[in-house]
Amino acid sequence: MDKIKIALQYMMPKHLISRLVGKLAAAEMGSVTTAAIKWFIKQYKIDMSEAAQSSPEAYSTFNDFFTRALKPGIRPISDKKDYIVHPVDGAVSQCGPIKHGQIFQAKGHEYSSLALLGDRADDAKRFEDGDFATIYLAPKDYHRIHMPIKGTLSKMTYVPGELFSVNPLTAENVPGLFARNERVVAIFETEIGPMAMVLVGATIVASIETIWAGTVTPPTGKKVFTWDYPTEGPAALTLDKGAEMGRFKLGSTVVMLFAKDALDDFADDVTPKAVTRMGQPFAKIED
């Protein structure tokens, strides 16, 4: 059965399906939208008591519901100054060292940091022998992405690619999954060196957005695009620890990269399959 599921992943028109779902998710369809939201809440056991707007009727589109805000204070940002924090609600897929430019995906599968970053050798070099963490966001999760540490945006890269589903089955069977799927790479300058936040798309991910550029995907293309940003002066964009930096509309996975010697160790509860909550301690900063 698993082989059939993987074969279907290769065969189905993933981009077409994703864009059609995206159009439906953005449409205002009144009672149809409300019914879809109610079904989704029941199907995935979503705790709407955490949402700033708890009523399904409060959302005019499915996208509005999916990117719903939380009540103020529901995800407090850890005040431990020697720790970075979880950027999202989700589950840890993998975390650990970047060895010889390779990132661990699943048993028997690795991919290169160079490929993940859109074959930008100068960017990949900054993360040689550093650390990575991959966090998967399930449909039930809060889908806004926040800063693990205060940082100033220096670069954003859009990398075209596939739109395979992201789950344990595909991670174990699709080589280089996160370096094959469409993604947006944001690089920040922080007190512990460069940090990459890679927002990875997947099947039926309607769009990837950042707070500075709005919707980055779609539209899509076959070219890698890079935008450079000033890190000093009035035009520089600096985001505080815990500040929102982006969001997924029906979305997927965040891969974080850190430079060599930036992190001392991951928090004790940060292990594969561990549930994450945005704002909680994630990794200790190297002294």
UniProtKB/Swiss-Prot annotation:
Modified residues (Pyruvic acid (Ser)): S252
Active site, per annotation: D89, H146, S252
Cofactor note (record): Binds 1 pyruvoyl group covalently per subunit.
UniProt name for this protein: Phosphatidylserine decarboxylase proenzyme
Bilayer disposition of the protein: Peripheral membrane protein
Tagged with keyword Lipid biosynthesis: yes
Quaternary context: Heterodimer of a large membrane-associated beta subunit and a small pyruvoyl-containing alpha subunit.
Pathway in which the depicted protein is active: Phospholipid metabolism; phosphatidylethanolamine biosynthesis; phosphatidylethanolamine from CDP-diacylglycerol: step 2/2
Superkingdom classification of source: Bacteria
EC number(s) stated in the UniProt entry for this protein: 4.1.1.65
Compartment list: Cell membrane
Cofactor: pyruvate
Keyword set, alphabetical order: Cell membrane, Decarboxylase, Lipid biosynthesis, Lipid metabolism, Lyase, Membrane, Phospholipid biosynthesis, Phospholipid metabolism, Pyruvate, Zymogen
Site (Cleavage (non-hydrolytic)): G251, S252
Protein source organism: Shewanella woodyi (strain ATCC 51908 / MS32)
Catalysis performed (reactions): a 1,2-diacyl-sn-glycero-3-phospho-L-serine + H(+) = a 1,2-diacyl-sn-glycero-3-phosphoethanolamine + CO2
Family that this chain belongs to: Belongs to the phosphatidylserine decarboxylase family. PSD-B subfamily. Prokaryotic type I sub-subfamily.
Alphabetical list of NCBIfam families matching this protein: PS_decarb (TIGR00163)
Any GO BP: phosphatidylethanolamine biosynthetic process
GO CC, any one term: plasma membrane
Keyword Lipid biosynthesis among UniProt keywords: yes
Function: Catalyzes the formation of phosphatidylethanolamine (PtdEtn) from phosphatidylserine (PtdSer).
Free-text description of this protein's post-translational modifications in UniProt: Is synthesized initially as an inactive proenzyme. Formation of the active enzyme involves a self-maturation process in which the active site pyruvoyl group is generated from an internal serine residue via an autocatalytic post-translational modification. Two non-identical subunits are generated from the proenzyme in this reaction, and the pyruvate is formed at the N-terminus of the alpha chain, which is derived from the carboxyl end of the proenzyme.
Entry's Gene Ontology molecular function annotations: phosphatidylserine decarboxylase activity
One Pfam family in the UniProt entry: PS_Dcarbxylase
